[in-house]
């Protein structure tokens, strides 16, 4: 089964010599785990779309009960945030909190939108990172119950 979706990479874990295990937050399927086969190889066509905190248009396919990335095209990579260690650390913190709150296979567009807006604020807006973090945490309370 194939699925085309937009996804944000919440976590990446090196696996074998050239693969990654990715935790994705998608619009349609919620949180899911997928393998990025060969995405650590030099010149891989899916490498850019399988980076941490990258919003990508992905084609996923199910292989032996697990999802795998077939195609990944970068939609937004939040480059300005990656140049500042504090902002990048807060982005990773937001991804970690989101991963804990999201349920595998259950769509949560509110949580996805909140994380994307927070990453945009860290990347483009001239807001203090502590203010963005506080707003993110407060707004996470609603989806968390």
Indicate where each model-derived feature is located.
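Non-catalytic alpha-helical scaffolds and adjoining flexible linkers that form interface surfaces
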Residues: 1-145
